[in-house]
UniProtKB/Swiss-Prot annotation:
Name recorded for this polypeptide: Transcriptional repressor NrdR
NCBIfam families reported for this sequence: transcriptional regulator NrdR
Family, as annotated: Belongs to the NrdR family.
Region (Disordered): 1-22
Chain ranges of the ATP-cone domain: 49-139
Gene: nrdR
Coiled-coil blocks: none
Physiological role: Negatively regulates transcription of bacterial ribonucleotide reductase nrd genes and operons by binding to NrdR-boxes.
Keyword Ubl conjugation: no
Pfam family, one: Zn_ribbon_NrdR
Species assigned in the record: Streptococcus suis (strain 05ZYH33)
Cofactor note: Binds 1 zinc ion.
ZnF unnamed: positions: 3-34
Biological process (GO), any one: negative regulation of DNA-templated transcription
Length: 163
């Protein structure tokens, strides 16, 4: 593993443990040349997954793109990056469990919305307003009315513990 400080390819593993998600190994390393300590993560190489967008174009699945979209929606909300990472892990697991090499972007968007409504309703509304491309305030108002009629199940920033 290349040292981020001196670029040496020689390093020693100091500590190795399984990450919380169970699919990743976290390794603490020390560069044999300069002594710099750094962390690496090892995960199973998944088969390539292609997302089919609304306009028919295709691009490689990116968990970072989902993570960044949720981060933007959760700005100034009591939602931790660990919570968001857990959401992205669950979404990726559901997408890969389908076993297909291609998935529609709408399916991913709906999975994100299912997760966000349980995590934080404001984050959900922010994400939905961009994802669904609301054309006016009336469409947003309809979404809010639907949420109110279903009853608020969660408190902001908390997961629903009743499930």
């Amino acid at each position: 593993m290349r040292c981020p400080k001196c670029q040496s390819l020689k390093s020693s593993v100091i500590d190795s443990r399984q990450a919380e998600d169970g699919n990743t190994i976290r390794r603490r390393r020390s560069c044999d040349q300069c002594g710099q300590r750094f962390t690496t993560y090892e995960r199973i190489e998944e088969k390539t997954l292609v997302v089919v967008k609304k306009d028919g174009t295709r691009e490689q699945f990116s968990r970072e793109k989902i993570f960044n979209g949720i981060i933007r929606s959760a700005q100034k909300r009591p939602v931790s990056t660990d919570d968001i990472d857990e959401v992205v892990n669950r979404i990726e697991q559901k997408v890969r469990a389908q076993g297909d090499s291609e998935i529609e972007s709408d399916v991913i968007g709906n999975l994100v919305m299912e997760e966000l409504v349980e995590l934080d309703e404001i984050t959900y509304v922010r994400f939905a307003s961009v994802y669904r491309s609301f054309k006016d305030v009336g469409e947003l108002e309809n979404l809010l009315k639907q949420m109110i009629s279903k009853g608020s199940k969660v408190k902001p920033g908390k997961k629903d513990e009743t499930k």
